[in-house]
UniProtKB/Swiss-Prot annotation:
Active site annotation, chain numbering: 680 (for protease activity), 766 (for protease activity)
Region (Disordered): 433-507, 569-633, 767-786
Site (Cleavage): 775-776, 1156-1157
InterPro entries: (+)RNA_virus_helicase_core_dom, Alphavirus-like_MT_dom, DNA/RNA_pol_sf, P-loop_NTPase, Peptidase_C21, RNA-dep_RNA_pol_alsuvir, RNA-dir_pol_PSvirus, Salyut_dom
Protein name stated in the entry: Non-structural replication polyprotein
Domain RdRp catalytic: 1474-1580
Limits of the Peptidase C21 domain: 627-781
Length: 1748
């Protein structure tokens, strides 16, 4: 600690480097050795675990490995543990030769290597098998002990007489003795299948292996004894699942004292405890194991909160269950924990504390406690009868315990240390001989129980003595873990003579035994028993995993190896191989391919004599990809009952499969959904029915759930066939839909009424009524012939499967997109056709260059063209091309042409189609295809073509009738090679073509199984495949590179290479070689996906392997693929995947469900979930209290308890509230001022008509000129259409910009660049030396103004801080309505990171001098923070504010918490002149950087705020993230203490610029007013350059502060702004509601009398008079009291406020606390009023007397 203090003291001095040099020197060597020994990248969450195990892992390595932590454990075992213990010549068994030679280089005592092929996989791992056993005195068996039994190991010692000791590594989870769920799932997982344990290291399924489940027996035996051999078994070390064992021949002489020490062993487990079993139920121990910290915190929480609801324990558990350190806890355990806490919350210790008890009281307690004992002694007959019964029950047992020992148990049944002493005394009588072989088998299975603590009664129960029947009757209820007691060792066998000791006659001891028995059955228990039972259940001991090891006695031994392994091989070539390997021999040269490192213990490397059967890994079947969004039908409040189908709820004879959609019963009389904007179906039906569209909609509301009638699909796409089916049931009709020359039938089959709807596919699709002349007849034959291609497409089948489309869409071209591409081609920026002008001399027609120029001219006058279009899309290799190729071979589709992006893909089409040579013109690359014509246009890999190519193709070929698109939106897009091309400026084709993708085929015939497993992809390729690295370069291989420059270099060297982007669409039979270089990190996820999915056989990575390290700067997708981890497509393509309707099997039938909007309803019917067991009410009122189980009132304090209801709080937020009552009364209360009235007469006004001035106030102008455009959208800050006005030529709302985020979609995006400052990366903001220097300057300047010593630190006042916590809770509960808090329940969601802030725009119409007649203005951004931040740091700011209010000099004025009257009084007292200096800032909040954080930290440390709160504040400020990106540590409106920190920062900056120690100064946020004309300090120019602020000071006579003109006479509201507000209110009709607030503001200056004219500039006299004229005309008699001379009493102000519907900030500040409380519950407060309320609440509630 002393060294740390020295480091902290010298860290900011010139001695920093000198004192830290020794630390650096000692760390360098350790770091270097760690990097060399452990080179693999261990997951960051496992690094602390390995460090706690004593393994020096740095976490700075970069070599990837699929299970790096296990590899690190193995390296530590070999090169640290074994290498240091090997001090004699030793042999190593079962190890790769390469690994052995590395170990031999580390320690030369490792002399020989012996491997034996016991499994087919061993032939690959062990190239030189041994044929004999080693001869050394010490063996090292590497990761194979779990495959050998004690019989075989004893046989090894018998076969090797020279063998003295054997070191062996064992991989087995210790907790497998009690559960099949891992206690460390980050490190390993396992499952148990009968006698096999399947082990998976670090989630790497490919590295999982099987081993015998009884391998755990090695950790339970302490010795192996045979008739001729004695071996001791020692567990040297345990590193999680890896254990190092030493088996050696026992010494002839042993210390006799060692036999008295129990051989107990324990293992490292999470800090946990075991919950008790429920009454009469048995829950597995694994599901009762919970974190100890969570249990202790929940135990305290349920007893500390005053109002505990049934949901609060579950809410508390939720705040803990998502923590990564608790991922070992099962969901059942969390459920049991919250249930247990809920049901035991009311239990309290059965104790009492009474002082000065009299002897008589003690005697009464003694008699009461021993009443049954006295009764038993008084009735010998009863005693004899009971004891005779107990003796008779024991006669069936041949062996029993002595009564003298049993009486202790009867007197104190299973309580206290006495029982443990009793059981220990009995256990000492047991023979300590080793277990026999049969007993050992049973014993090893029974001994694996959680190790008890010394004084745990449950521990003694876990040994479970087999007592007599009487003792069993006296046993208490089961304790956690007691279900294991039936498996423990019987001890009664150790007392052969116990039955003879039951003969003594009855004595007083027997009376005591009967007393205990009667108490057990009749009750009550003794007070001590009750207390012990309470502690046993509610304070259980910590969980410890361990057991007692026992010796094992064997009758015989088995051979260590099969006889076949020790026979010389028959082959001469193999027999010639040396055996064993000599130490000097080097391993053969390794292959050039870099092998994937092996797991810590795999079956292939550690198979033994009888290995467990190894089954090859198989890829699990993947479920179909379903929607990630839950259906809202489950939570629909308008329904009742479970989810069912419409056909089940409303039975009728519907057409098949038309009424199977999910539905619920509608509650009668529920609110009706608003009429839909897209009502073409209702209009079409109404034309054929007597009902109007509104009546049809009302009928739907009686049947359909509200969620279905307000769904986004219905609002955006219109009504569909589900609504048509519901109407058919209501009105009993059947309907026919004629769509794309097909007829679909819906409704009631037996209905006599038949309706017809004509559906136009669009876009947008549309329902219409049939032409009356046709009378609903189907389309004519001529129309059917014209659409024969559509019918053929929809009916085409290949191998019984349909094309993956749902309909034939209509596509309309955009000539502007075609013109862009044609211009770029003409100028040579895209394509090469313009370079082919020389070919014109070889042909009679125009050259390609001329034809492109002609096409460019045609685009200038081209009109949009509509054609039929289908889009086949799917994963790489899903078979999009093959069905289209078969379709084109049919007669209907013979007139086609195919467009491909590359020549390679064109060649594949030619070979697959196998057409005659004269048809080769039908296959073209994208440029030459523009010069050809055909009715059917097929475009393969559409997204690899330039943007606008589809539009240009339709203009170039007017004969096209049908377009077939093939492509995958997840793969790469086209990118021009010319920097001058403007094609990139067009919008992407992906969002444009996504609506035409009906289905996305999510399977593959191409990729091998190992690649398909990464994407959870159904795979039809039988090849397993591989993903490896290689150091070789094969010139003729399929080399995929990142850039064209590498391609050119490769071609110059004669090597085959193609860019990853160019390979899209190609299929390789041979492996794909992916080249890694610095451009790999720049690859998009689309290109990475292309590279991984080209080959049928596998993937090789070559080049720079650091890009596979999963670190910053590497390729994430490549890293995941190489490590075998799953690749989730939504993580890489979130904007695309969620819009795709994925299918995982070929389409065999199509849905006939339609909607009138753009897309049909193509999704399959969702699965209907089972009805819930306990349905909750649809709405829970905020005052619902029936779920409250504990409601404690304050025991002391004021008569009126200052507590607000917390019943409406979300359970996750309830845990954040302290629920501390404010008990200390405030020593300061608000008293009305006794100062004289400002003026006893009313001012004389030069009368001026308000409406006359208002008529000419607003200049005539075009408001649209002030608007801005953002992404083709116009802002809406000056709306004027359909707005009423009557006092001027335009609506008065045009006076200033209005911010309405709901109606202005450009408001927030256009304001971001001005209101927010972003960090360049996601890394935290780093405090610079300049920030530290400037922050100290600001702090000293601020202390100078307050006349404080900056070096003084005040002691922390804990009692006062508790009061601040209570006030903060009170303010958070009272500042918002209960409904608002419920609606924002997500703010306390534990899944919301507390460093994440949601930014949204503030809705306001700000009217002041700066905004009147101003231009477009950026909105104010508000930050929505987590409740944890507000409730944790809020008390800190209130604590600081309290000290600042008390110590603030009188000449410094902070406006927060003060009323306009307070401002007037302060001005009258301190201001001597109207001359002033004001200041304005540019981007005040955004310009506060690291220096503001340093300043805030120094302010908190001055008051000794706890360091954990300071660290939290710094962490939040430097790590803020938003939905738009990471922010700098700027000031955010919404963070705790925004106003205080802004005001302090402003004051500190002003004092750096001017000397304010004696200058009257008013500050409020970024606003300031300095009395007089001041001169800057001499050092101000230097300090100014360090600040990021841009100041705009000005000296003038009439200065504004917070909207008021100030002077020695007082203050007056700016009449210009007030006049503008009155105009706006008069025009929009809200003047009646707002008049009380505006009148109150006006009365502040009006009360000054004639002196008010001295404060106003002369040009504002007319506006003051006009305002007075308006109030005289419009104010009521009661409101005009405010205009009378003198001060208005508080009661009158409160009455006026409570009757108003609008409260302004100044008016709100003058109200009483009672009125403010009523107003806050009456309607939602504005955020400005919320911030104003905090200091007022503190003024009334905080005990100022506590401050010393």
């Amino acid at each position: 600690m002393a060294f740390q203090l020295a480091l902290d003291a010298l860290s900011s001095t010139t001695h920093r480097d000198s004192i830290s040099a020794p630390l650096l020197d000692s760390s360098v060597s350790q770091l270097q050795s760690s990097l060399e020994l452990f080179p693999y990248t261990v997951p960051k969450e496992l690094v602390p675990q390995l460090n706690r195990m004593g393994i020096q892992v740095s976490g700075l390595t970069s070599t990837p490995h699929p299970h790096a932590a296990h590899k690190t454990l193995e390296l530590n075992l070999l090169f640290n543990h074994w290498a240091k213990s090997c001090n004699v010549d030793s042999a190593v068994v079962f190890m790769k030769p390469s690994k052995f030679f590395k170990l031999q280089e580390k320690n030369s005592h490792f002399k020989s290597l012996h491997n034996y092929r016991l499994h087919p996989h061993d032939s690959n791992r062990y190239p030189h098998p041994s044929t004999s056993l080693p001869t050394e005195k010490r063996f090292y068996i590497h990761d194979s002990l779990m495959y050998f039994t004690p019989h075989q190991i004893s046989g090894l010692f018998e076969s090797c007489p020279n063998l003295l000791s054997l070191y062996a590594s064992l991989v087995v989870p210790p907790e497998s003795s009690m559960t099949d769920l891992s206690l460390n799932p980050d490190l390993y997982r396992y499952s148990i299948h009968k006698s096999t344990l399947h082990y998976t290291p670090e989630g790497h399924s490919a590295g999982s292996y099987n081993q015998p489940v009884n391998a755990l027996d090695w950790l339970k035996i302490s010795a192996i004894q045979t008739p001729s051999l004695s071996l001791s078994v020692s567990v040297l070390e345990s590193w999680g699942p890896l254990h190092s064992l030493l088996i050696e021949r026992s010494s002839q002489t042993q210390n006799p004292d060692s036999q008295k020490i129990k051989d107990l062993i324990s293992f490292q487990t999470p800090q946990a405890l075991i919950l008790p079993n429920p009454d009469s139920l048995a829950v597995p121990l694994r599901h009762r194991l919970v974190p100890q910290k969570t249990y202790d915190a929940l135990f305290t929480y349920t007893r500390a909160t005053r109002t505990l609801r049934t949901s609060d324990p579950a809410g508390f558990v939720r705040t803990q269950s998502n923590k990564p350190e608790f991922n070992w806890v099962t969901s059942q355990a969390w459920d049991n924990l919250q249930t247990y806490a809920l049901l035991t919350a009311s239990y309290r210790p059965p104790v009492s504390y009474t002082l000065h008890r009299s002897p008589l009281t003690k005697l009464k307690e003694l008699l009461t406690r021993n009443a049954l004992k006295l009764a038993a002694m008084a009735s010998p007959a009863l005693t004899l009868a009971i004891f005779t019964t107990m003796t008779a029950l024991n006669t069936n047992s041949s062996k029993a315990l002595s009564f003298s020992a049993l009486k202790i148990h009867l007197l104190n049944p299973l309580t206290g240390p006495e029982l443990l002493h009793f059981q220990t005394s009995v256990l000492q009588q047991k023979n300590s001989a080793p277990l026999s072989q049969a007993e050992a088998k049973q014993e090893l299975d029974k001994s694996a129980v959680p190790a008890p603590s010394e004084h745990d009664s449950s521990a003694s129960q876990s040994t479970s003595l087999s007592l007599s029947a009487s003792s069993q009757l006296l046993s208490t209820e089961k304790h956690p873990g007691s279900e294991l007691s039936s498996k423990a060792i019987p001890v009664s066998t150790s007392c052969p003579s116990a039955s003879k000791q039951l003969a003594p006659p009855l004595t007083a001891e027997s009376h005591s035994s009967v007393n205990a028995l009667l108490r057990k059955f009749l009750g009550p228990n003794s007070p001590q028993s009750n207390l012990d039972n309470y502690n046993l259940h509610l304070h259980p001991e910590s969980f410890t995993l361990g057991w007692k090891r026992r010796p094992l006695l064997l009758d015989s031994h088995s051979s260590f190896l099969p006889s076949s392994c020790l026979q010389p091989p028959a082959s001469p070539s193999i027999a010639a191989a040396p055996h064993p390997l000599p130490p000097a021999q080097k391993p053969p040269r390794p292959p050039t391919t870099v092998p994937t490192p092996k797991p810590l213990a795999s079956p292939s490397q550690t198979q033994a004599a009888q290995p467990a059967t190894q089954s090859p890994p198989s890829i699990p079947q993947t479920a179909p990809v379903t929607s990630l969004l839950p259906a809202p039908l489950e939570t629909d409040d308008s329904c009742a009952g479970p989810i069912s189908t419409f056909q089940d709820l409303f039975p009728a004879s519907y057409y098949p499969h038309t009424a199977n959609f999910p539905c619920r019963s509608k509650i009668p009389g529920y609110l009706e959904a608003p009429y839909p904007p897209l009502d073409c179906m209702l209009v079409a039906l109404s034309a054929q029915m007597p009902q109007s569209p509104q009546e049809l909609w009302s009928a739907l509301n009686t049947l359909m759930p509200l969620s279905a009638l307000t769904s986004p699909s219905l609002r955006v796409l219109g009504l569909g066939t589900e609504e048509l089916t519901a109407l058919s049931y209501y009105y009993h009709f059947q309907a026919e839909i004629h769509s794309d020359n097909e007829i679909y039938r819906f409704g009631i089959q037996t209905a006599s009424t038949k309706l017809c709807l004509i559906r136009d596919s669009g876009p947008p699709a549309h329902f219409t009524a049939p032409d009356p002349l046709r009378a609903g007849s189907p389309p004519s034959r001529s129309q059917t012939n014209e659409n024969s291609l559509r019918r053929s497409l929809l009916g085409f089948r290949l191998n019984g499967n349909l094309l993956p489309i749902d309909q034939v869409h209509s596509f309309t071209s955009e000539p502007s997109r075609a013109k862009n591409l044609a211009s770029n081609m003409k100028n040579g920026f895209d394509g090469i056709l313009t370079t082919l002008a020389a070919l014109s001399s070889l042909s009679s027609g125009p050259s390609p260059r001329d034809r492109i120029f002609t096409l460019d001219g045609i685009c200038d006058f081209a009109l949009p063209k509509t054609v039929d279009l289908i889009h086949l899309s799917g994963f790489a290799g899903c078979g999009k091309t093959h069905p289209i190729q078969q379709l084109l071979k049919t007669p209907h589709f013979h007139n086609f042409r195919v467009v491909t992006p590359t020549t390679n893909l064109r060649s594949e089409w030619k070979s697959d189609m196998a057409l005659p040579a004269h048809h080769n013109w039908r296959f073209s690359t994208w440029e030459s295809a523009l010069l050809k014509h055909a009715e059917i246009l097929v475009i393969d890999e559409i997204y690899k073509l330039p943007r606008g190519y589809l539009d240009l193709s339709l203009i170039a070929d007017p004969t096209v009738k049908l377009v077939i698109l093939l492509g995958d939106p997840l793969q790469g897009e086209y990118h021009s090679t010319s920097a001058h091309s403007s094609n990139l400026r067009l919008s992407s084709e992906i969002p444009r073509l996504l609506p035409f993708i009906d289905y996305y085929c999510y399977w593959s015939y191409r990729v091998p199984k190992c690649v398909a497993k990464l994407f959870s992809l159904p795979c039809f390729n039988p090849s397993e495949g591989f993903i490896k690295t290689t150091l070789d370069f094969f010139p003729s291989a399929n080399n995929l590179v990142n850039s064209h420059s590498v391609v050119h270099i490769s071609e110059a060297c004669g090597w085959n290479a193609v860019t990853i982007s160019s390979s899209q669409g190609c299929t390789f039979s041979d492996p794909a070689f992916i080249h890694l270089d610095r451009n790999t990190a720049l690859l998009s996820p689309s290109n990475c996906l292309v590279a991984l999915t080209r080959s049928r056989s596998g993937v090789y990575f070559k080049g720079d392997f650091t890009f596979l390290s999963s670190l910053s700067g590497s390729s994430r997708m490549f890293s995941l693929a190489y490590s075998g981890q799953p690749i989730h497509l939504p993580d890489f393509f979130p904007e695309i995947v969620f819009q795709l309707n994925m299918i995982t099997a070929p389409l065999t039938k199509r849905s006939s469900s339609f909607r009138s909007g753009f897309q049909p309803n193509i999704s399959s019917a969702p699965k209907i979930p089972a009805p819930p067991n306990l349905p909750c009410p649809p709405h829970i009122p905020t005052n619902y209290s029936k779920d409250v189980i504990v409601n404690n009132q304050a025991l002391y304090g004021e008569s009126l308890e200052r507590r607000l209801s917390v019943l409406h709080l979300p359970p996750t937020r309830m845990t954040l509230h302290s629920d501390i009552n404010i008990t200390a009364p405030s020593s300061s209360s608000f008293q009305p001022s006794d100062e004289p009235v400002p003026s006893d007469h009313t001012a004389v006004y030069p009368g001026f008509d308000f409406f006359t001035l208002a008529a000419h106030f607003l200049p005539a102008h075009d408001p649209e000129v002030k608007e801005i455009e953002l992404k083709d959208q116009t802002s809406q800050q000056f709306p004027w259409l359909n707005l009423d006005f009557h006092i001027s030529c335009q609506t008065s709302s045009l006076i200033s910009a209005r911010h309405q985020p709901g109606s202005d979609s450009t408001l927030l995006p256009a304001s971001l660049h001005k209101r927010l400052r972003f960090r360049p990366t996601a890394a935290p903001y780093q405090i610079t030396p300049s920030d530290s220097f400037l922050g100290n300057c600001l702090y000293r300047s601020w202390c100078q103004v307050y006349r404080r010593d900056p070096n003084v630190r005040l002691p922390f006042n804990e009692a006062l801080f508790l009061e601040c916590i209570a006030v903060n809770d009170y303010a958070q509960l009272s500042s918002k309505t209960q409904a608002t808090i419920v609606a924002n329940a997500s703010r306390s969601d534990p899944d919301w990171r507390h460093t994440f802030v949601k930014i949204f725009a503030k809705s306001q119409h700000k009217v002041n001098d700066g905004s009147i007649f101003g231009p477009w203005k950026a909105c104010q951004t508000l930050a929505l923070m987590h409740d944890y931040v507000i409730l944790t740091l809020g008390p800190v700011k209130k604590y600081q504010r309290l000290f600042d209010q008390l110590e603030r000099p009188s000449h410094i004025y902070y406006h927060a918490g003060n009323t306009p009257h307070d401002l007037r009084r302060w001005c009258s007292k301190h201001l001597e002149t109207s001359h002033c200096t004001t200041n304005d800032y540019t981007a005040f909040d955004q310009s506060q950087h690291g220096e503001a954080v340093v300043f805030e930290v120094l302010k908190m440390r001055r008051l000794s705020i706890p360091e954990n709160l300071i660290s939290l504040h710094v962490h939040l400020k430097t790590n803020v993230e938003t939905q738009f990106g990471p922010l700098t540590c700027m000031r955010l409106t919404g963070e705790p203490g925004t106003y205080d920190d802004n005001t302090d920062y402003n004051l500190a900056v002003l004092n750096l610029q001017y000397d304010l120690r004696k200058t009257p100064t008013l500050v409020s946020g970024d606003d300031s007013y300095l009395s007089g004309t001041l001169s800057p300090r001499s050092n101000w120019p230097f300090v100014k350059e360090l600040l990021h602020l841009r100041l705009k000071p000005s000296s003038l006579i009439d200065g504004l502060f917070c909207g008021y003109y100030l002077g020695p006479q007082g203050c007056i509201r700016n009449p210009l702004a007030l006049f503008a507000k009155l105009m706006i209110a008069e025009d929009d009709g809200s003047a009646f509601d707002k008049l009380p607030s505006y009148l109150t503001e006006f009365s502040i200056g009006h009360g000054l009398g004639d002196s008010l004219w001295q404060l106003l500039p002369s040009d504002l006299v007319l506006y003051q008079s006009a305002c007075f004229d308006y109030f005289c005309r419009k104010a009521t008699r009661s409101q005009k009291i405010l205009l009378q001379p003198g001060l208005v009493d508080q009661e009158t102000l409160d009455k006026i406020a409570l009757s108003a519907k609008f409260i302004s900030r100044p008016f709100y500040s003058m109200l009483s606390s009672h009125a403010r409380s009523l107003i806050s519950t009456k309607f939602k407060l504005d955020s400005s009023l919320t911030t104003l309320q905090d200091p007022m609440v503190e003024f009334e509630l905080l005990p100022f007397s506590n401050v010393q």
